Structure formats: C-alpha cells, structure tokens
C-alpha cells in the first residue's frame, strides 16, 4: 500500500509515476473522499471537545447546587451525535482504504517505459544456446520417450494443466529442488523455513494478491476463507506481519520449497501443452527483509543467487528488467530471468525477482526498530524464485536431450541422483 501521506501531499506526482504502468489514478475520487474525511474528522474532534467541556460543567454545576438535568441531556445529545459522526467517519475510512488498496506500487525511477513484455529491456545474457545436429524435441516428447512424464493420467486424476512424473524424471525433479535448497542455504546463507500451504485473507492482502487478484487463486469451499498459496512469497513474507525486528537482525533471509496453486484464469489457450503453465507446480522461493537503504542492493544480490542455479546447471539464460507496463502490482522494480527453451527457440521466464520497497510492509505492518531513533520503521521486502522447479526441469530435459532420446544429467545434479549420468527409457 502506498503511503497515505504521499497521496495527500503529492497526489499529482504519484499519478504521473503510475502512468508508467498504464494506470490512471482517479485523483478526483481520492480528493473527494479525502476532503469528506477531513470534514468528518474535524466534526468528531469538535464534538469530542464540546462533550468534554460540558461534562466538566456538570461537575461545577453540581458543586454549586445547580440543576444539572439540562446539562446531562446536552451531554447525552453530544454523545449520540459523536457516535453517529464516528460511525460515518469509520465507514468513509473503509471506502478510502478500499480505494488506496487497489492502487499499485509506484515504479522505481530507472524502470523503463513500456506497455507489455515486448518492451522489457535485456540487461545481460549468460551461456550460448546449444546447436543440435538433430531435430529438437520438446519436453513432452522427451519425457514420453523416457517414460517419465504422463499428462494423460494426470488429466484422468484431476484435469488439464496437471502433470504426473515417475522414475528418473521424478527423481530429477527432486534433485533440482535439493540442489536449489542446498545452494541457497549453504552458499547464500538463507534460513530454510517450512510454511503452511493454506493461508488466510490477511496474508494475501499483506503481499498484494487481495483484493485485486482473487480470480487467480484457489479458494477453499468452507466458511473460513482460506486459500491455497499461489507462491511461497505469501506465507514466507507474512512471517514478518505485525512484527518489529531489531535492526541487528537484518537482513533476514528466508528460503522455502513449496507447491504453488494458480487458477491461470487469464491464461486460457496459452501454453496448454506440457509443464510451462500448470495449476500446480513447485518453486524454491527466496525472501529478504532489509532496511530501506539496502533494498535495491538486496534485489541485485537475490537475483544473482537465482542466477547461480542456472549457471550451475549450465543453462543459457538472459536477464531482463521489466518495463512499467509489465511489472507486478506490488513491485517497484523487477528482474526476470528467462531460460533458453530449444523447442520454442526463445527464452522463457523461470524466475521473477522483485523489490517491493515498503509497499508490502505497510500492508502487513512489518517493521524494524531503528537503532539511532529507537523508533519502529517499515521494512523493505524483496523476493524471487530460486527457481521454479518444473520449468527448470523442462529446460534441463530440452537442453540436455540426445539424439537417441536419452537425456544427459548435468554434473551438478549427479550427486543427487546416485551418480547417474544419463536417464533413458528402461
């Protein structure tokens, strides 16, 4: 959530910044609600003051032996008027909060202009796409040849956009997860956390999925308003909700491996084949909680941590900075890592690493105690995938495929697969 003071004092500047997203801030609606809020706030304060004055007069009149009946009636009338005014103010503040909650984060100054992913700017590339001397197969056909990817049975069990893995491919999926976790824990010094896969509305509000993106979520059909997590970002970042950290504890680095569940409501007809876009998939998620002055450097660091996995696996990728029109609702700056997919002849997103400034922290009231002022201040939050496990599996199957239908196991994965060097149909 944006700082209400910023909206009150620099509304036009905020509106101008949000235009980089293609978002038109309704300044008139905000101004009208804010003026009504100030009027009601003033009325409440005036009624409170008048009630307090009249209450004191009752004591004086009683001491002087005067009839206090009329004064008691006046105080009762003021109490009723104040209660009504406070109720109206509370309702108006709810309207104002709903409006502000739907406003996306401001983008950082160096975020490029643009309307869509076509306008994202490439920052760097690593590795060279392999040249094959045979016809490249996509991961669906590679998996079918090995006998380890079964979409038909998954569809029978559940429906479209689910997958079933078995044998060496299931083992490779697990090995990728272990490689990611061990790298981030042992080398990058993240603390592993195990979190709930079901969250409440407050958690989803805190990270910015609610109220705007409810259609993308799987909601449990009971009266508790629980949801399956769309990303580990939600439960992991919400560890900080309502907390005040000592400055000496920062930065806090968490890593978690979880399944993720998304309805893909806006993706009808896109990536319907294979594992690229699934209702259920797994990720290893990185989250950092830092002081405001450290957040942009932390974004660079976290992105490098995600890149390290791709480099260990020898997978060609590129790094792009998202333009204003493609950046997420809560983010102020985002890098995407896109891995080379040979069957498609292009790079596809495998990790999105974002700095949120204090946007999520304000919604969650996640703070740290400034050692100089001894006052609590809002944290900055950063998160990213390190990496999406299923898409990494796709990239390995395609980039390491061989003409005979087998798949070479990257050296970094071999210790996690009992020293195997190749997977092939049994």
Swiss-Prot record:
InterPro entries: aa-tRNA-synt_IIb, aa-tRNA-synth_II, aa-tRNA-synth_II/BPL/LPL, Ser-tRNA-ligase_type_1, Ser-tRNA-synth_1_N, SerRS_1_N_sf, SerRS_core, tRNA-bd_arm. CDD domains: SerRS_core. L-serine binds at residues 231-233, 285, 385. Its EC number is 6.1.1.11. Pathway: Aminoacyl-tRNA biosynthesis; selenocysteinyl-tRNA(Sec) biosynthesis; L-seryl-tRNA(Sec) from L-serine and tRNA(Sec): step 1/1. It catalyses: tRNA(Ser) + L-serine + ATP = L-seryl-tRNA(Ser) + AMP + diphosphate + H(+); tRNA(Sec) + L-serine + ATP = L-seryl-tRNA(Sec) + AMP + diphosphate + H(+). It comes from the Bacteria. Signal peptide: none annotated. It is an enzyme of class 6 (ligase). Keywords: Aminoacyl-tRNA synthetase, ATP-binding, Cytoplasm, Ligase, Nucleotide-binding, Protein biosynthesis. One of its GO terms (biological process) is selenocysteine biosynthetic process. GO terms for molecular function: ATP binding; serine-tRNA ligase activity. GO terms for cellular component: cytoplasm. It is found in: Cytoplasm. ATP binds at residues 262-264, 349-352. Catalyzes the attachment of serine to tRNA(Ser). Is also able to aminoacylate tRNA(Sec) with serine, to form the misacylated tRNA L-seryl-tRNA(Sec), which will be further converted into selenocysteinyl-tRNA(Sec). Belongs to the class-II aminoacyl-tRNA synthetase family. Type-1 seryl-tRNA synthetase subfamily. Homodimer. The tRNA molecule binds across the dimer. Consists of two distinct domains, a catalytic core and a N-terminal extension that is involved in tRNA binding. This is Serine--tRNA ligase. It comes from Saccharophagus degradans (strain 2-40 / ATCC 43961 / DSM 17024). The lineage of its organism: Bacteria, Pseudomonadati, Pseudomonadota, Gammaproteobacteria, Cellvibrionales. The gene is serS.
